[in-house]
Structures are given as structure tokens and as C-alpha cells.
């Protein structure tokens, strides 16, 4: 294998010799799970063609293998541009590469064969999700959803035919589209600025497909439509938007729908704006997203979707225990009689048809045609009846509102740790309030809620329901009642004679449907109290509608600008208005827990939590009264949040040439640009200021640090790989070519005039400088003992007792000093010459005869250019240089005045971890901010 040329693109991998790549010992390979069909095993290193392998064994055979060698042709970029993460961060779940990059791998292989004059192989069939011999776990899991699979089977023969209605005309673009659904982060109301334009999620998906298309075909002409004045980009975006609407319909029933497609922002019932916002600390920054960063740079992202993680989200469908079937809330009476098309109450008083419009259903029917859904009861008013389904959402949309309006309900809520433990669903009921809620005597409020049991194993269980409800103070009928209503009751069959006891025979026969007890008594008082707070604005608009007055469209159009200017005044007036019954109904919070118990067991298991959200038909939109139809809409809820950092950091797989470790760009904010990578690489490999060979620091990898790295340019490790916890800011002299000695090894004492690495464990206050180390003391020595570490292993400490988890402890049990670079003092040549004699005395006082095991500091003083190394590799440190060891210093004018505040103890009041002398670093470390991976809520226990 020959070395590659220096002009390598971002899409063409850089060949790496076998001696330059770490090849771990081959693990056990289960060919029954790792390879299918007639696929051959990858070549070993002994053959000269190294293919790195990482086979991960799990108890389940669904996701069992991971071939890291297949990533090299697609994801591997030059080593100096793709730093890998250290083992301090747990690697992601093993997964195989995305199928959307198979076309790129074949394209790269063709380019490589042309470069090396290798004859092309036989043409291959385009990689599709139904390709034989391809492992199931290497395919996007969305292809296996039954509804979408049927759609793709119907469209498969049209994809490659231009005039037959194909969506993309290339099958690889469909793979890229399906992958982009998993790759693109959820943005909410935010936009990503790229190329001077704000991009939403659909626009970013279009850009992703464009990048794949250019890498595959060389241009975007495939999106051009004849006889269209739109640009290619506009055509592609319209095509993506239309295809997105078609694909979304196949996944509407998923519990994880909101992880794939952003849920529609719905207004909070009864208010003008939605409270479903996300705080900034809950979201992952766009600057640290590798997908968006790659699109902004016009290249194919190095990351791919985590198929195993999304497969686990899709597997939530198998844990559905119940499904809503019927929700009806109505008022009926058995004492109302209908004679001669007139309804009479128990006292033979006629009822007003205008107050009870539902009586009209009985007036126009006779004999056996009369409604009999309620038996002998007559329907007087219907609050809600229709049932519809909406797409899934996060449970935070409910709990965040409760945290503000119903803190007692929020405190009593016990959410599950995982979505597999308990089913969460929401019932959003829009009720039609009665005009005066004065019903005849003998009327009853009925809440009929029925759910179907989807798990056959649960149909023979005993069931019970725990209901909790809170209401605002305005709807309280009795001041002495508790703030929260709580009730626990068993769920029995209709007509069960022993409903007060749990030992009835309801569970002896399997039940496919169960009736959820509804707190009708509580809601009867709530609905009766709500009508006492009239809604004047909606009533006025309803009267105008009944009079047949239509709004003047021309007048409204001419006053639109004035209306927009008055929005702020309308908002202020809207907030000062009196609360209405609709506003109070929206503040009612209720949830019900469904528990089941096996017939031969006494252990109750929580199967589902039903969250109730109530609103009325009188709602607001942009401070204007609007009307909504009555009905109930339900949807699935999840504990996991697609907007959280937990999800966005696990939705992607970060391939690397050295293993399954996550790259540093995933946890750095902002992500270093390409120019920053190149600058660091050139400073590392070509700058003389970074080249030295006299360091005695024991490290796992050879690190190029100013004056302390290993010599030569043979080391391919980048500057960023030297620091496992993030970037470290180089000193200002990193780009300067200093006339250093050949050895390049300087101890801590050499940097008196311009040292940018102050000591962390000084020799106490006995020296004139109050904290400078002895010439033989390392910057990372603790309690006089040498600690072998690297510059990147040291981080600033927040307090004297705080300990960074990424900071290795001292070998001798002493304190660990902190490195601080923020409060740098300015030293000029005069000050250096003035304190040179004091520094020599300080070196003699603090000399302890230890070995020089720390990293040297940076020196910017021109008078120290001819210094030699203060210590050798294996011997004891040399004494303070005298006589011929000192080179001639340049004559500099002495400062007549010395600033007394430079050595004021106030500047050294910030202590780090106690070192020798009880004092730590006085200055904070100046470095790039690194976001720490914070696990959020786990989804499965296997992570």
C-alpha cells in the first residue's frame, strides 16, 4: 500500500500504513450473526490489507456485530483532522454504518482504483433496504415499519424510472432522506444560520440530500424540473417538503413519532401563546452539532444515525398496554319524559328547547327509531363525545404547566424512569360548557371512559384506578375541602353486583375493554361553578354571529397595519381582564393511574398513566376570541425528550479510525473549524517552537507541547488529541520562532521573565516570588512527589476542595495542583533583569534533588535564548547555572520604579488544590470551554 498524495479531499480517505494504525487483538467472531450469505471474512493484518474489527457480543442477537473496518472507506478522514475521544467518555452502542453512505463508499473505491490503476470489478446492484445478505441491523429501522415498508415496496419500481412517478429518481437519495430524518436535530422554534440564511429542519434535510447528491453525481441537476422557473434548490426543497408530508402519515401511531418528526406547536388552551418552551440549558447547542457543522462547510457529515438507539425507540410500540377507545361526558336524566314532542321534567314542567338543544334528536323520531344509547335516560347536554388521535409528544408539555399552575399535583406525580416501565398518554378534552348549567332535578353527569387492553396477558388481570385532581380556588365549593382530590377504586365489569370489593368474579373471564372510573361528582361541581364566570367577549361575538353580521374584509385589510401596532396594547388588556370559566377550566389538573394484578399474585403493577388536559370551546387566538369544536384528542407521551442533550448526543454514532470512541467535536462547544484544525496541525508539525526532544514526561501518547513534546514529525497525533478533556489554548508565543537550545528542555524556573505556566505547588512563601517552583520541581508535582501526566490532564479547579473527574490523582497521595493561565502579569525586560537575582536565590532555596518529570514552561525573554537544559533525562537536576553556563545577556535599562501591586497578596487569594506549602494556583486556567456529557434519562437498562 503506497502513501497517499497531500491533496486529499474530505470525501477521499487517506491511506494509512499498517504500522501506523493500532490493530487490537481480533475478538471472537460469530459468523452466524456477524456475516450473512456468502459474505467473506475481512482480511487480516498479515495479508497487508488491514480491516479493523470491533465485534460486540450481546445476549440479544438483534444487534450483535459491528465491523469497524467498513467505516474506513466512508468516514475516515486524515488522522490529523479527525481527533478521537479518550476512554474517559463511554463509547456509544456498536452499530453498523448507514446505508446512505454505501453509494459514497463505492464512489470512493472507484476513485481509489483509478488512482492506483486497479481494474474495476463487476457492477453491483444499488444498496437497498431489501438487499439480500445485508444484516438487518445495518438498515435504517424505519424501513421495517409495516406501513412504510408497504409504501416502499409499491414505490421501489418507480425510483429509477424518471417518467414513472419516481420520488428521487435515484434509490440512494431515498436512503439519504430516511437517514436525515434521524440525523437532523429537533430545533423547536429556533433556526440555524447557514450561508446568510436561516434554515429550518426541512431546509437542512434538503441541504443534506444536496450534499449526498453532489458527492454521488457531482451536481444537483437531478432535482431540476422542466418548465419551472424555480432554482434547483427551491425545487429540491419543495420535493423534500411534499415527500415529508407523505412519509409522516405512515408513522403517526408511533410512541416515538416526535423523535422522528417535530410535533406541531399547539397553543395552550385558553391562552394566547404556548407554554411548551424549552429553556436554553435543556437544549444542545447547534455549534456543537457535527451534522450542522458539516453542512455549513459543504461536506458530508462524518456521523451517522444510531440505528440501535432508534430501534429501541421504535420497540416502544411493543410495550403499549392500553389504548383509548371511548371518551364521553354528558348529562342525562331518567325522569324526563317526552310527550307530543315536548320534554317534561319530573314536575311536569316543560323544558326550553333552546337551553337543551340535544332534545331535538328525540322530537323528530317516533316508536322504535328513538335513540336508545342511554337506555331509558334522556340526553340533556353533551360536553364532549368525539375521540381523535394526535401525534406523540414529551411529558414535559404537561408537567411544566402543572409545575406553575398546580404545584401540589406536580409534587404528587411519580414518573417512571424509563418509557418501557409504564405507558404514558394524554387526554385533551374540549368541553362545551352549558349556558347556565341549570338542569332539571334527577339529572346525572356521566363520564364514560373506556380503554382497550392490547396485551393478551393482561386481559385476565384485576384492575384498579388511582385518580388525583386539583382545581383552582375559584372553583372550590367548600373551603374546608383538601386541595387535592384522591381516590382509589377497583375496575369492574358493567353490571357487577360486588363493586365495593376486590374479590369479585370480574377477572375470571378475560376482558378486552375496561371502564376507567371518572370523578363525576367532582366534575359536576366544577362545571357548575365555571358558568358563574361569564365570558363576555365570546358571548358578544356569538351574538354578532347569530345576527348574521359579517366582518368587512376591506376594512380589516386596511387596518391590518394599525392592528399589528396595537398588539402590545391588546396583550396588556388581555392580561388585565377578569378570569372566565374557560380560563379556570384550563387550570384543572387530573391524572389517573391504571394498575393491574395477576389472578395468582398480590403484587400490583402500574401499567399506564392517563394525563388529562381540559379546555372549553371558547378559546383565544392572537388576542381574538375563537371557537373550537368539542371533542377529545389523545396522544402518546414519553419521558425521554427529543430536544434534550441526552437524545441528541445518543442519536448519532461517531466513527473513528482507532475504535468506537466518540470524537472530541461531539463534546466541544463550539466545534473547531477546519482552519483551526489546520492551524494546530501546522503549528504542531512544522513550527520550531513546538519541536523539542528533551522532555522526560511519561505519557501514553507522544504529545507536541511547547518545549515538552517528543521530537520529530513522525507522530501523527494532533494537538487536540493531546488533551482528553478538550482544547487547551496555546501560549501567545506558540507561533513565534524562538532561538531555543538544541535540547529544548526547560525547567519551571527558567520562565521568570515570561512564563505563561505559573506553578501550582510552589515552595511556600520563603522565596521572593512567593510561589515559583524549584528548578527541579515539575509543574504538576504535589507534596514534593513527581506525578507523571500530561498537560491536557490538568484542569482548573473550582474551589480548594473540588476535584475534577478528569484530573488524575497524585501518585503519592498528596494534593493535586491546578493549572491556571488567566490572570497573566506582564513582564518586560527591565522587570526580568531586576528580578533575575531574586530568582537565582529562590532556585537554591527550593532545590530538593528530585527528578525533572514535569512539562517545561514557555519562555519569551530574549535574555534566556542561550540557556541550556536544566536537567538530563535520567540524572538529578543540575544546580543553579553559574559561570560559563550563563550566556551574555543583552543590556537593558533598569526600571527605576517597581509597581508594588504586582506582588500584592490580593492577587493570590484564589487558592487551588493545596500543594506543597498549602497554596495552589492563583490564576484560573485559560482554555476552550468544553461541555461535559451529562446523561440524562436512560431509555433502556442496557446502556
UniProtKB/Swiss-Prot annotation:
BrlA, abaA and wetA are pivotal regulators of conidiophore development and conidium maturation. They act individually and together to regulate their own expression and that of numerous other sporulation-specific genes. Binds to the sequence 5'-CATTCY-3', where Y is a pyrimidine, making both major- and minor-groove contacts. Residues 59-68 have a biased composition (Polar residues). Keywords: Activator, Conidiation, Nucleus, Sporulation, Transcription, Transcription regulation. Residues 865-889 have a biased composition (Low complexity). Pfam families: TEA. This is Conidiophore development regulator abaA. GO terms for molecular function: DNA-binding transcription factor activity, RNA polymerase II-specific; RNA polymerase II cis-regulatory region sequence-specific DNA binding. The keyword Repeat does not apply. SMART domains: TEA. One of its GO terms (biological process) is sporulation resulting in formation of a cellular spore. Induction: Expression is positively regulated by stuA through direct binding of stuA to the abaA promoter region. Residues 1-69, 111-133, 537-575, 809-901 are annotated as: Disordered.
Amino acid at each position: 500500500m503506497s502513501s497517499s498524495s497531500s491533496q486529499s479531499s474530505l470525501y477521499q480517505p487517506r491511506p494509512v500504513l499498517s504500522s501506523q494504525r493500532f490493530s487490537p487483538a481480533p475478538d471472537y467472531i460469530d459468523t452466524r450473526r456477524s456475516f450473512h450469505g456468502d459474505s467473506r471474512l475481512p482480511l487480516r493484518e498479515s495479508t497487508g490489507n488491514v480491516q479493523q474489527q470491533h465485534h460486540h457480543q450481546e445476549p440479544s442477537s438483534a444487534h450483535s456485530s459491528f465491523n469497524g473496518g467498513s467505516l474506513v472507506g466512508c468516514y475516515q478522514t486524515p488522522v490529523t483532522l479527525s481527533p478521537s475521544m479518550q476512554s474517559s467518555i463511554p463509547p456509544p452502542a456498536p452499530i453498523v454504518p448507514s446505508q446512505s453512505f454505501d453509494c459514497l463508499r463505492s464512489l470512493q473505491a472507484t476513485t481509489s482504483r483509478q488512482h492506483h490503476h486497479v481494474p474495476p470489478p463487476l457492477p453491483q446492484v444499488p444498496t437497498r433496504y431489501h438487499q439480500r445478505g445485508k444484516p438487518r441491523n445495518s438498515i435504517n429501522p424505519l424501513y421495517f415499519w409495516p406501513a412504510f415498508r408497504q409504501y416502499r415496496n409499491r414505490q421501489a419500481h418507480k425510483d429509477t424510472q424518471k417518467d414513472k412517478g419516481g420520488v428521487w429518481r435515484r434509490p440512494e437519495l431515498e436512503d439519504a432522506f430516511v437517514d436525515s430524518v434521524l440525523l437532523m436535530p429537533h430545533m423547536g422554534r429556533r433556526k440555524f444560520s447557514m450561508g446568510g440564511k436561516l434554515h429550518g429542519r426541512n431546509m437542512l434535510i434538503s441541504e443534506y440530500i444536496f450534499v449526498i447528491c453532489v458527492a454521488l453525481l457531482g451536481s444537483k441537476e437531478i432535482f431540476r424540473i422542466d418548465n419551472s422557473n424555480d432554482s434547483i434548490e427551491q425545487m429540491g426543497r419543495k420535493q423534500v417538503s411534499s415527500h415529508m408530508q407523505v412519509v409522516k402519515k405512515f408513522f403517526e401511531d408511533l410512541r416515538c413519532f416526535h423523535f422522528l418528526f417535530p410535533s406541531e406547536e399547539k397553543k395552550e388552551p385558553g391562552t394566547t401563546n404556548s407554554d411548551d418552551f424549552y429553556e436554553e440549558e435543556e437544549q444542545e447547542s447547534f455549534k456543537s452539532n457535527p451534522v450542522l457543522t458539516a453542512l455549513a462547510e459543504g461536506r458530508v457529515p462524518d456521523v451517522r444515525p444510531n440505528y440501535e438507539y432508534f430501534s429501541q425507540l421504535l420497540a416502544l410500540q411493543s410495550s403499549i398496554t392500553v389504548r383509548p377507545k371511548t371518551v364521553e361526558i354528558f348529562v342525562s336524566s331518567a325522569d324526563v319524559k317526552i310527550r307530543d314532542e315536548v320534554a317534561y321534567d319530573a314536575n311536569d314542567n316543560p323544558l326550553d328547547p333552546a337551553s337543551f338543544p340535544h332534545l331535538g334528536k328525540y322530537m323528530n323520531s317516533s316508536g322504535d327509531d328513538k335513540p336508545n344509547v342511554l337506555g331509558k335516560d334522556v340526553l340533556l347536554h353533551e360536553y364532549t363525545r368525539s375521540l381523535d388521535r394526535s401525534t406523540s409528544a414529551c411529558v414535559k408539555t404537561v408537567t411544566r404547566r402543572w409545575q406553575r399552575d398546580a404545584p401540589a399535583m406536580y409534587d404528587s406525580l411519580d414518573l417512571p424512569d424509563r418509557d418501557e416501565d409504564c405507558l404514558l398518554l394524554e387526554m385533551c378534552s374540549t368541553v362545551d360548557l352549558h349556558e347556565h348549567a341549570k338542569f332539571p332535578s334527577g339529572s346525572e353527569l356521566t363520564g364514560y371512559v373506556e380503554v382497550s387492553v392490547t396485551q393478551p396477558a393482561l386481559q385476565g388481570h384485576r384492575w384498579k384506578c388511582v385518580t388525583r385532581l386539583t382545581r383552582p380556588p375559584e372553583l372550590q365549593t367548600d373551603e374546608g375541602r383538601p386541595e387535592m382530590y384522591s381516590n382509589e377504586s377497583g375496575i369492574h365489569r358493567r353490571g357487577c353486583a360486588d363493586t365495593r370489593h376486590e374479590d369479585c368474579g370480574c377477572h375470571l373471564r378475560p376482558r378486552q375493554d375496561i371502564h376507567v372510573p371518572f370523578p363525576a361528582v367532582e366534575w359536576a361541581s366544577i362545571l357548575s361553578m365555571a358558568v358563574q364566570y361569564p365570558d363576555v367577549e365570546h358571548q358578544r361575538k356569538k351574538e354578532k354571529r347569530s345576527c348574521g353580521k359579517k366582518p368587512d374584509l376591506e376594512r380589516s385589510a386596511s387596518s391590518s397595519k394599525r392592528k399589528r401596532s396595537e398588539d402590545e396594547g391588546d396583550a396588556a388588556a388581555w392580561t388585565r381582564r377578569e378570569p372566565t370559566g374557560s380560563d379556570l377550566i384550563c387550570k384543572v389538573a387530573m391524572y389517573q393511574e391504571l394498575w393491574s394484578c395477576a389472578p395468582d399474585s398480590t403484587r400490583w403493577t402500574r401499567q399506564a398513566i392517563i394525563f388529562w388536559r381540559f379546555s372549553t370551546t371558547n378559546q383565544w387566538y392572537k388576542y381574538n376570541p375563537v371557537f373550537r369544536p368539542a371533542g377529545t384528542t389523545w396522544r402518546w407521551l414519553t419521558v425521554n425528550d427529543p430536544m434534550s442533550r441526552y437524545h441528541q448526543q445518543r442519536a448519532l454514532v461517531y466513527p473513528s479510525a482507532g475504535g468506537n470512541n466518540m470524537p472530541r467535536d461531539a463534546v466541544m462547544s463550539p466545534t473547531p473549524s477546519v482552519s483551526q484544525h489546520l492551524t494546530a496541525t501546522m503549528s504542531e508539525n512544522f513550527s520550531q517552537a513546538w519541536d523539542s526532544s528533551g522532555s522526560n514526561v511519561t505519557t501514553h501518547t507522544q504529545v507536541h507541547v511547547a518545549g515538552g513534546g517528543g521530537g520529530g514529525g513522525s507522530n501523527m497525533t494532533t494537538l487536540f488529541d493531546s488533551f482528553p478533556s478538550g482544547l487547551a489554548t496555546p501560549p501567545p508565543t506558540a507561533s513565534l520562532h524562538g532561538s531555543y537550545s538544541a535540547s529544548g528542555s526547560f525547567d519551571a524556573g527558567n520562565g521568570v521573565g515570561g512564563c505563561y505556566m505559573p506553578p501550582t505547588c510552589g515552595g511556600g512563601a520563603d522565596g521572593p516570588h512567593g510561589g515559583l517552583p524549584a528548578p527541579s520541581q515539575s509543574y504538576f508535582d504535589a507534596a514534593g512527589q513527581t506525578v507523571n501526566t500530561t498537560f491536557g490532564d490538568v484542569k482548573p479547579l473550582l474551589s480548594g476542595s473540588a476535584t475534577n473527574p478528569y484530573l488524575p490523582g497524585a501518585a503519592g497521595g498528596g494534593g493535586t495542583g491546578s493549572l491556571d493561565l488567566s490572570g497573566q502579569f506582564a513582564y518586560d525586560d527591565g522587570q526580568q533583569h531586576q528580578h533575575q537575582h531574586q530568582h537565582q536565590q529562590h532556585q537554591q532555596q527550593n532545590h530538593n534533588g528530585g527528578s525533572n518529570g514535569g512539562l517545561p514552561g514557555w519562555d519569551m525573554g530574549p535574555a534566556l535564548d542561550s540557556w541550556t537544559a536544566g536537567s538530563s533525562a535520567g540524572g538529578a537536576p543540575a544546580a543553579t547555572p553559574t559561570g560559563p553556563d550563563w550566556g551574555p545577556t543583552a543590556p537593558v535599562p533598569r526600571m527605576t520604579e517597581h509597581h508594588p501591586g504586582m506582588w500584592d497578596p490580593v492577587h493570590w487569594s484564589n487558592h487551588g488544590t493545596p500543594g506543597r506549602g498549602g497554596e495552589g494556583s492563583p490564576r484560573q486556567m485559560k482554555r476552550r470551554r468544553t461541555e461535559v456529557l451529562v446523561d440524562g434519562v436512560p431509555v433502556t437498562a442496557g446502556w
